[in-house]
Amino acid sequence: MTDLIQAPESEQTWPASALGPQQRAAAWERFGTEQFDVVVIGGGVVGSGCALDAATRGLKVALVEARDLASGTSSRSSKMFHGGLRYLEQLEFGLVREALYERELSLTTLAPHLVKPLPFLFPLTKRWWERPYIAAGIFLYDRLGGAKSVPAQKHLTRAGALRLSPGLKRSSLIGGIRYYDTVVDDARHTLTVARTAAHYGAVVRCSTQVVALLREGDRVIGVRVRDSEDGAVTEIRGHVVVNATGVWTDEIQALSKQRGRFQVRVSKGVHVVVPRDRIVSDVAMILRTKKSVMFIIPWGNHWIIGTTDTDWNLDLAHPAATKADIDYILQTVNTVLATPLTHADIDGVYAGLRPLLAGESDDTSKLTREHAVAVPVAGLVAIAGGKYTTYRVMAADAIDAAVAFVPARVAPSITEKVGLLGADGYFALINQVEHVAALQGLHPYRVRHLLDRYGALIGDVLALAAEAPDLLSPIQEAPGYLKVEARYAVTAEGALHLEDILARRMRVSIEYPHRGVACAREVADVVAPVLGWTAEDIDREVATYNARVEAEVLSQAQPDDVSADMLRASAPEARTKIIEPVSLT
């Protein structure tokens, strides 16, 4: 896919969607000198979706993120684009219908290179009532979202269920139901939404922290931002500011010095990652727990297992998993596995935070996953709550509210028809895998790996190796990835630090037992020429990354949130000028 919107050649020689060092410098200059229609705060999937929605309506958009794209909730989900089967029990039919429609849209049109169908087994444990009860729920699930490109449910005997999942205890089920949902690399998807927004003209910049809201009388007219890398400060003027910061919603709202229309309650969810051979199964699984459900999701050569659902009132940027969280996950899945998992089986662990709309319930698992849009003060729109899957609808609703402050007639949302970068041409390239592999001297499985991460942008990735063939070799201690992917991460995907690359552009930090430590220096050497790192810079980046991993691993042996949080907080920040938390000035 080529860029449709580009600046004059004298001003720009790289694609508008390429978030590299040159674009980052140019964005800073534009922020301080131009008037924008919409300023979006937050580089998660909802903020990126807001930027895309506004840009494709013809608005002039700035998107700022204090850390990295998808560095919060949007890289730490259960990796599913799903309707939320469990929400049917809470009678949230509208939410499930909306999410299923969005799932189908992304699977077939918007992001087929990123969102993939995934068969699930729902093991049945009660002989009389459970099968008709669950079958009715899944039947409703199959029908609610309209057209479907995945198969309908299939009922299985115990023997049939065990053929799909031989790793289950025979005594753990009496039968099962197979149904379909989808899986997605959430961080890559969010990044692609943001880059698609840039493709259509949005000015996107990471490491750009909002430290104040600009006011003119009773109206918000922009933001003051601080560069999280060097501490430089500038101001961005906009007709309207959209607060799409997820778990930081209340913090940004406080900058307005006005009471918000809703509050966000933060819930922590923990997942563990184990090698694929530790659980023998051809399908994903969903297990009922006392409070919610537990997912076992295939993820390349691994399984992702989770999640927990507990209140979190500590560091929002670096939520910590505890030994108690991990023990709970292992104990839950071991009730059904023929060969129990142990801590020694775990290659990776991650904790994420859910921004839930605060309610009367003390149980976060019962709080609504619906979203809300509010205008707490003129010129400021806030969007919070919701599910990852419904990001596009959330973004459209937020921009619908924002356009009231734009002094021009604005077109309605069209993102239902706008494929993400890499989608156009993906299916044709899938049919040409052997040809592309022969052309590049790569194994076909490598080409398929790249297509399922970059889609039709694969040519841009491989072009970086044209004059440096060594970039097509695997990263030595993370052979699932090629060196060229690291180079592309800093050339076109906005990565500024090793953590950005190893935890989000790639998923080395959860897929390898060393969590990226063993390959940090090799990757630093690959990206240093693009980022202008000196030998001293490389040493500092590697040391910072290693210290953060060490603190994270140690925190996962702690018995409670407070002690785990203290350990994580003891590690240095890669973004040395970040302010946490932002306070009123």
UniProtKB/Swiss-Prot annotation:
Main location: cytoplasm
Known EC number: 1.1.5.3
Gene Ontology biological-process entries: glycerol metabolic process; glycerol-3-phosphate catabolic process
One cellular-component annotation, GO: cytoplasm
Binding site for FAD: 37-65
The entry's keywords: Cytoplasm, FAD, Flavoprotein, Glycerol metabolism, Oxidoreductase
Group of enzyme by EC: oxidoreductase
Cofactor or coenzyme needed: FAD
Superkingdom to which the source organism belongs: Bacteria
Catalysed reactions, as listed in the record: a quinone + sn-glycerol 3-phosphate = dihydroxyacetone phosphate + a quinol
SUPFAM superfamilies cross-referenced by the UniProt entry: FAD/NAD(P)-binding domain
Any one Gene Ontology molecular-function term assigned to this protein's record: glycerol-3-phosphate dehydrogenase (quinone) activity
Subcellular locations according to the entry: Cytoplasm
Assigned protein family: Belongs to the FAD-dependent glycerol-3-phosphate dehydrogenase family.
Name of the protein described by the UniProt record: Glycerol-3-phosphate dehydrogenase
Origin organism lineage: Bacteria, Bacillati, Actinomycetota, Actinomycetes, Mycobacteriales
